[in-house]
Amino acid sequence: MRADGATVTFIGTGRGSGAGLVAAAGIDDDVVPMRGLERRLAPKNLIAVALAAAAVPRAMAILRRRRADVVIGGGGYVAGPVALAAWLMRIPVLLTEADSHLGMANRLAAPIARRVALAFPIAGRTGDKYVVTGRPIGPEVRAATRAAGRAALGIADDAMCVLVVGGSQGARTINRAVAQAFGDGPSFELIHLAGAGQLDDVRALLADRAPGARYHLYGYLDNFHDAVAAADLVVSRAGGSVFELAAIGRPAILVPYPHATADHQTKNAQWLVDAGAAVLVPDTECTAERIATLVAELLAEPARRDAMALAARTVARPDAAQAIAAAALQLATA
C-alpha cells in the first residue's frame, strides 16, 4: 500500500511481538489499552469489557487525527473496537481472517465491515462482502529458492533434507516422535526446529543418543523461509505455516494441534491434503514409528514428492497481501 502512495499506520496494545514488527517496518503506531476475553466466566473479563468500551472513543480520536480513509482489521481483540469506531465515523472497514473460521473479533465486526478477506472459504460466508484472498506471506517467502536456502543453512545440494517444525513454542508430540525416530543418526540432513520452549526437552531426549552431524537442532530460525526452501519434505503443525509451505511448494506431513480453536489446524491441514500436497497424521497417531515410516516412504518416492510439491504451488496464493491491499485501496477511494 505504501508503494501505491498510501500512508499506513497501526493501532495496537503496544505489547507482544507485533509491536516490535511494526517498529521494524518503520510504521507509526498508536496504542489503545486492551486485553482479550477469557473463554470462561472470569472477573478479568469485566476489565476487558471496560477497556473495550473505553477503546472506542480513543480509537475515534486516533482515526480522526490520522485522517483515516479505510481501516483494516487483523482479527485481534483490538480490531473490534477500532472497527466499531470506524463504522461510527463512516470509514469503510476491511477485515482479514487468517484461519479457517472467523475468530470472535471478526464474527462480531463482520456485520459492519464492507469486505472480509478470507484465508480459506468458510461455509455461510459468501456474497460480495466475502472474498477468498489467502493469507499474506512475506516477500522473502515468495523469493525463497532451494539453492539459497541450502547455502544459508550449509546443506549440500545433493543431500536429502527433512525439515521438522513444531511451531514457535514447539510441539511436544512431534518433537518426541522425531527425536525417538532419528536420535541415533538420520540417513538424511534433518533440520529440527523444536521451538524455544521445547529445546531443552529435546536435548534431554537426545542426551543418551548419537544424533550425529546430520541432525541440526534449533529452537527457531529467523530465516524460516530458507529452511522450508532447503527441504525435500516438511513435518509440521498446521498453523499459518501451511501458506508458506504452499507458496514455496514443499510436500508435507502435517500433525494438527488438537486443541486449536474450532480445530482450525485440522481444517488447514485438510486444505493441503485435499489438494494432494500433504499427508495428515492425527496428534494421537504421531509416534516415532509412524513418522519414521512416512518419512522413509516419501523420501523413497521422488515422483510422489514432485507431484505433492506441484499440488502445493497450484493452491498457493502468494499474492494474498497484494489482493488485500488492492481491496483496501478500492474502499478508501470509493
Residue ranges and their predicted role:
Residues 317-334:
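C-terminal alpha-helical cap of glycosyltransferases
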Residues 16, 21, 25, 146-151, ...:
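Donor-nucleotide binding loops and adjacent catalytic segments primarily
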Residues 68-70, 218-221, 229-243, 250:
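Acidic donor-binding loop of glycosyltransferase active sites
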Residues 7, 17, 28, 87-147, ...:
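Active-site-proximal region of nucleotide-activated glycan assembly enzymes
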Residues 304-318:
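A short, well-ordered alpha-helix in the C-terminal region of glycosyltransferases
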Residues 58-71, 79-94, 107-112:
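Glycosyltransferases and closely related glycan-assembly transferases
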Residues 2-54, 133, 196-198, 284:
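Conserved nucleotide-sugar phosphate-binding/catalytic loop shared by glycosyltransferases and other
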Residues 89, 229-231, 246-255, 275:
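Conserved donor-binding/catalytic loop of nucleotide-activated donor transferases
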